Amino acid sequence: MNSSQKRVLHVLSGMNRGGAETMVMNLYRKMDKSKVQFDFLTYRNDPCAYDEEILSLGGRLFYVPSIGQSNPLTFVRNVRNAIKENGPFSAVHAHTDFQTGFIALAARLAGVPVRVCHSHNTSWKTGFNWKDRLQLLVFRRLILANATALCACGEDAGRFLFGQSNMERERVHLLPNGIDLELFAPNGQAADEEKAARGIAADRLIIGHVARFHEVKNHAFLLKLAAHLKERGIRFQLVLAGDGPLCGEIEEEARQQNLLSDVLFLGTEERIHELMRTFDVFVMPSLYEGLPVVLVEAQASGLPCIISDSITEKVDAGLGLVTRLSLSEPISVWAETIARAAAAGRPKREFIKETLAQLGYDAQQNVGALLNVYNISTEKDHNR
């Protein structure tokens, strides 16, 4: 490490291809690493999707057991020790929602001057009850007592974790989930090649979905949709990219419903921008979300997106690509909406890029905003 280089420690559950992880990596790739370097503290000591890239970019990876694997006091002590042993750090940036207050406390005890708590979700579970709300208030007090800066991917996520009053006081930095807009720009000429490389059908309606296999992503609803389309005789293929604890269960359910010839399980996909070119429409029926990076990526790719109204309307970039539907709507309404959207015209490439950049979804532009949060000044941040 050179003497002028600043190091920032990001804390996440694991560096797989989730929304928060992808957002951080998009910023990391654009950062001038001769001046600012990222390191990562995670709760997983098994290999994750982004590990090799992090190491190749000069970052380091550290591990501590999660708060659920230990207890709050032990967790804070472990995080503090990891910070002190591997620092100094100019900032610690925590992305683990309600746990961020414990991380900010550990960073304060370790003497880190800038401690950032970042909200990426509008809830952390389904069936949010009064006990959960009381717990959230306790976590919020811990965050506000120890963080020097608050960030959120959108207003709803900021309001959920930090409270309405802090949003009104403009204490929360809104940092949209920026991406590489040029990388995701539509390229229809490459679609056939990308389909062939992944075993995706060349002559069917391709319905795409990219997410980890967790309850909140509602993969069971996608299988219900697939069964309905099959009953109607629609020639389609549902392409599911991602991995996670429910993957085996969902695949078995697809087998039991005789859907394996119509549903393709791709596993973890490294080149999402290429995969997007193979889709005719993107579907996301999540039970709740913050502001998903993948929906920004889908719109940047020119894809019509049919999403649940549990996802914030602020994800709609105004390109005419997003349709929000209630999960209580008949499955036939979803199917008809998908068919219409897939057949509709698409906005032009330059219009997409300009619109998303104006909304703050250009990762290159967001680098400067993030450095301001860290109180780090650099002349230029154009290293790729």
Curated annotation (Swiss-Prot):
Pfam families: Glyco_trans_4_4, Glycos_transf_1. Keywords: Exopolysaccharide synthesis, Glycosyltransferase, Transferase. The gene is epsF. The keyword Glycosyltransferase applies. InterPro entries: Glyco_trans_1, Glyco_trans_4-like_N, Glycosyltransferase_grp1. It is an enzyme of class 2 (transferase). This is Putative glycosyltransferase EpsF. GO terms for molecular function: glycosyltransferase activity. The keyword Plastid does not apply. GO terms for biological process: polysaccharide biosynthetic process. Induction: Repressed by SinR.
